[in-house]
UniProtKB/Swiss-Prot annotation:
Pfam families: GRDA
Gene: grdA
Name of the protein: Glycine/sarcosine/betaine reductase complex component A
Keyword field: Oxidoreductase, Selenocysteine
GO molecular function: betaine reductase activity; glycine reductase activity; sarcosine reductase activity
Record family assignment: Belongs to the GrdA family.
Organism name: Symbiobacterium thermophilum (strain DSM 24528 / JCM 14929 / IAM 14863 / T)
Oligomeric and partner information: Monomer. Component of the glycine, sarcosine and betaine reductase complexes, together with components B and C.
Keyword Oxidoreductase: yes
Active site: U43
Length: 155
């Protein structure tokens, strides 16, 4: 999946990779950021993705062709990252927000995934992400987000 020319929805994590760092990375790869947020994944109610972010993602999926959109995650742990990926592709599993029962089919990638990382300017990645890559469980996060994408993403 090539980032260049895509419209990126950025869902950063206060305890992982924040929105501004993700924005810098995807912009360096040629994507247009259409929405960026930093939330506290572990703070959200009942493990659900932030309600306002769900609303914005839904609006963007209605505004742009879904095949032009990509969601880039910065979650600090696998479960929260997987939950966000599932919400934007298959609907809110907590049935708590605007995406409850709404299957957008959007592709979500974590910034750590090799197919995303290799498209980012190495200097930008080093400055914005590499420190967190050293302290988080990259393998578990990548595996979880990839499995959700392979199961639910349609575009």
């Amino acid at each position: 999946m090539e980032l260049k020319g895509k419209k990126a929805i950025i869902l950063g994590d206060r305890d992982g990779i924040p929105g501004p760092a993700l924005e810098a990375c995807v912009r360096s790869a040629g994507a247009e950021v259409v929405f960026a947020s930093t939330e506290c994944f572990v703070u959200t109610s009942a493990g659900a993705m932030d309600m306002e972010n769900q609303r914005r993602v839904k609006e963007l999926a209605e505004k742009y062709p879904k095949e032009d959109l990509v969601v880039i995650l910065g979650g600090a742990e696998a479960e929260a990252s997987g939950l966000a990926a599932e919400t934007v592709s298959n609907g809110d599993p907590a049935w708590a927000g605007p995406l409850a029962g709404v299957q957008l089919g959007l592709k979500a990638y974590h910034i750590f995934e090799p197919e995303i990382k290799e498209q980012i300017d190495p200097n930008v990645y080093e400055e914005q992400v590499s420190l967190m890559e050293m302290v988080l469980d990259v393998e578990a996060i990548v595996q979880e987000v990839r499995s959700i994408r392979e199961k639910y993403a349609a575009w």
